[in-house]
UniProtKB/Swiss-Prot annotation:
Residue numbers of Leucine amide PTMs: 69
Signal peptide span: 1-20
Cysteine pairings via disulfide bonds: 44-58, 52-68
GO molecular function, one term: toxin activity
Name of one Pfam family that matches: Toxin_7
Descriptive protein name: U2-agatoxin-Ao1q
Propeptide boundaries: 21-34
Tissue expression as described in the entry: Expressed by the venom gland.
Family, as annotated: Belongs to the neurotoxin 01 (U2-agtx) family.
GO CC terms of this entry: extracellular region
Protein role: Insect active toxin causing rapid but reversible paralysis in crickets. No activity shown in mammals. Does not show effect on mammalian voltage-gated calcium channels.
Length: 70
């Protein structure tokens, strides 16, 4: 009986912590978990390697220079 009550309390605590995370922050975490997204004006590779954050694109400025830009 105690184990059932403990399990319910732990489940309620986990659910309340998940609900407390703002939606945008949750999206940012999932982008980071996908494989290291890059912020604005960082070097990137359009074909492989780390991707830019959502809303940014890897733009080729020259043959050797590509950056995450909006």
């Amino acid at each position: 009986m105690r184990s059932i009550i403990s399990l319910l309390l732990i489940s309620a605590m986990v659910f309340s912590m998940i609900a407390a995370v703002p939606e945008e922050e949750g999206l940012q975490l999932s982008e980071d978990e996908r494989g290291g997204c890059l912020p604005h004006n960082r070097f990137c590779n359009a074909l492989s390697g780390p991707r830019c954050f959502s809303g940014l694109r890897c733009k080729e400025l020259s043959i050797w220079d590509s950056r995450c830009l909006g």
